[in-house]
Amino acid sequence: MRQNYDDRKIVKQYREIARQIVKKEGLYKNMDQAELCEQTNFWREKFKTKPMTDRDKINIFALAREAASRIIGLDAVVVQLIGALVLGDGKVAEMKTGEGKTLMSLFVMFIEVMRGNRVHLVTANEYLARRDREEIGQVLEYLGVSVALNESGLDIAQKKAIYTADVIYGTASEFGFDYLRDNMVRQKEDKVQSGLDFVLIDEADSILIDEARTPLLISDRKEEDLSLYHKANKLVKKMMKDDYEMEEHKRFVWLNDAGIEKAQKFWGVESLYSAEAQSELRITMLLMRAHFLMHKDKDYVVLDDEVLIIDPHTGRALPGRRFNDGLHQAIEAKEGVEVKEESRTLATITIQNYFRMYKKISGMTGTAKTEEEEFRQIYNMDVVVIPTNLRVNREDMQDDIFYTKKEKGRAIVYEVSWRYEKGQPTLIGTSSIKSNEWISGLLDAAGIPHQVLNAKNHAQEAEIIAKAGKRGMVTLATNMAGRGTDIKLDPDVHKLGGLAVIGTERHESRRIDLQLMGRSGRRGDPGFSKFMISLEDDLLEQFESKSWEKLSAKLKRKAPRDGKPVNSRKIHAVVVDAQKRLEGANYDIRKDLLSYDEVIDLQRKMVYKERDLLLERNKLGVSSEKILREVAEYSFIHPSDIPEEELEIYYSRQKELLGGTKFPISFDQVTLMEPREVVEEIVSWHKKERNKFPAETIAAIEREVYLNLMDQMWVMHLDAMVQLREGIHLRAYGQQDPLVMYQKEGAQLFEKFQADYHFYFAHALLELDPDGLIQG
């Protein structure tokens, strides 16, 4: 991606600072390790009271540069220092693959530690976190900076030890889950995360954009009638195209009138949209999504009778991750494997809202400029393209577009065969396991040996990528093709043209295409890239346009069956347009997810803040007497002109509040008393009972009960919000915006949640027994 004017201006500004850093390389040359550590301590102390100047930055970068030269034998070049300065400004640095992002990270992490910040370095997976912690961590430790690796499966004591380090490496999900788990603990001492100061995200586009569609969830099992999934599967398998409508690129499908009638007959209900048929409607819609929108070997893979999600942007299977809200169960029913119980959400947060809690955030990646608008709007981060140290020496060809997949397949085999014969290594990129296996079959038939990398054999990824640059090697890979690792070329491959990259489909995002192209031509190596696509590819199949349908039909009728590609500007323009439309649709989905999550994010922050206060004080923030009085007044005092039917609600609430408690006045007697008198009796009796116990004992009991009830009700509230989110589009009507309806009804549910746990806490206060314990 080329630099724009603003990028060039920023790079020019930092180039001079970077050159001054390089000129300082003699400053620390003669110091031993102890003296370098003294320098580290000097800078740490200085910035506790004074701001950091550009001159300070130059000296600190020079210190880190000297340590890197000694420990790992790498001297940071000017462009790496420019990139680090960009990161220090809270921006995304786009640096081409192989240009040294890992070394670049050293400088910004070191300088943030000098500022007094704890640093979290987030990578795409635990393998990369471990690798980078070992390589760059040793440089930081040489300078007296503590470094740790945040892995899954550690106990609280181990986690707490990790979070005392200055720099912590880990994955986005592990940091996010630690945050969620911290807000489920019962004792303050069990919290592990100690502040969210600065986060540096490697492969920022993958983590902040691609993974943003899947929220982080902590869950347990939810009781449900799983047989409904199998029944709904039978219904959906019988559906014809005229029973439903769908917009595949928006991932949305719905029943038309014919489909509704068929479903109502199948389920034996008068109206599919009645309250009684809520479960049947929900599960029918889930099975429709599973059958018509979710595709095997593209969206998921079945391995050992288990449905595994495929990350659409990396091609990797995601063990342990499940589609939420019942979709995973629907796919299991569709595929005829065991339908496992749906999970119940205990805690959840989106990637976007987790990382937006950090005081400062920076990112680095090989491809980000195409998504700059999203980085700005959601994370308030600009993207700056960092120039390469050596000129990119890769030949990028215009797409070859064929009429049919069959013609495309033949052309790919021909292209690969002559490159294989001359010994040039070739990487063939596919967008799904299905197309990956189809191309593999064609290569087998042509007698071309090759290695295959996809979600089914991801365990061999490092080994496969290590061989991909060898002379004569043909590698067939989905999007997962070794992101974060270099494809190193054999020495004699350079004269053969370097690594050739053949893309077999344009992806839903130009960024993914650029990543594939970026496998070749690293660090000034020669290389070649070309996409060979067809009019029957998924990208164009999803592209709904009357003009495109007419053009496609016309082209296929007139197509010369010589297997040659189409050289038409109009078709190239359609491909570009289709890709842009799908990018826009996917951005809308992510923005939509964030808009809905912002409703619950505000609620989550309020609940977690109250939890923190409870853990901090070890007692209630307000007196139990005040809560009891409010609940009693709410239950017993009502307007005199209240309708008869609403009186029943009041009586029911009064019975629930007093029923089964130690309160000495019977409910029959209570009904004969004045409401205000009842309230005062309840409050005074509780006060008398409470005073029988030591203050610390009763405070601890009340705090524990309150916390327990709040947590239980919060889980129920999250479930209610999921149900609301699922059904809001089905209930949207007229000109009403579903999001506005969700915000309004979500606020009402939150008010109910707060009222409920206060109510049950008041009930519990009236259950105090003579030993100071609460029954039930």
Swiss-Prot record:
Signal peptide span: none
Biological processes annotated in GO: intracellular protein transmembrane transport; protein import; protein targeting; protein transport by the Sec complex
Xref: Pfam families: P-loop_SecA (PF21090), SecA_DEAD (PF07517), SecA_PP_bind (PF01043), SecA_SW (PF07516)
E.C. number(s) listed in UniProt: 7.4.2.8
KO phenotype (gene knockout): Cells show reduced secretion of autolysins p60 and MurA, as well as at least 7 other proteins, and are responsible for a smooth to rough phenotype change. These deletion mutants are not as virulent as wild-type when used in mouse infection tests. Large in-frame deletions of this gene reduce secretion of autolysins p60 and MurA, as well as at least 7 other proteins, and are responsible for a smooth to rough phenotype change. These deletion mutants are not as virulent as wild-type when used in mouse infection tests.
Residues noted as binding ATP in the record, renumbered to the chain: 80, 98-102, 486
Main location as per UniProt: membrane
InterPro entries xref list: Helicase_ATP-bd (IPR014001), Helicase_C-like (IPR001650), P-loop_NTPase (IPR027417), SecA (IPR000185), SecA_DEAD (IPR011115), SecA_motor_DEAD (IPR014018), SecA_preprotein_X-link_dom (IPR011130), SecA_SF2_C (IPR044722)
Catalysed conversion reaction: ATP + H2O + cellular proteinSide 1 = ADP + phosphate + cellular proteinSide 2
UniProt GO molecular function: ATP binding; protein-exporting ATPase activity
Membrane topology label: Peripheral membrane protein
Annotated keywords: ATP-binding, Cell membrane, Cytoplasm, Membrane, Nucleotide-binding, Protein transport, Translocase, Translocation, Transport
CC annotations in GO: cell envelope Sec protein transport complex; cytosol; plasma membrane
Subunit structure: Monomer and homodimer. Part of the essential Sec protein translocation apparatus which comprises SecA, SecYEG and auxiliary proteins SecDF. Other proteins may also be involved.
UniProt xrefs under PANTHER family: CHLOROPLAST PROTEIN-TRANSPORTING ATPASE (PTHR30612:SF0), SECA INNER MEMBRANE COMPONENT OF SEC PROTEIN SECRETION SYSTEM (PTHR30612)
UniProt cross-references to NCBIfam families, sorted A to Z: PRK09200.1, SecA2_Lm
Similarity annotation: Belongs to the SecA family.
Function: Part of the Sec protein translocase complex. Interacts with the SecYEG preprotein conducting channel. Has a central role in coupling the hydrolysis of ATP to the transfer of proteins into and across the cell membrane, serving as an ATP-driven molecular motor driving the stepwise translocation of polypeptide chains across the membrane.
Protein name: Protein translocase subunit SecA 2
Upper classification of the organism: Bacteria, Bacillati, Bacillota, Bacilli, Bacillales
UniProt gene name: secA2
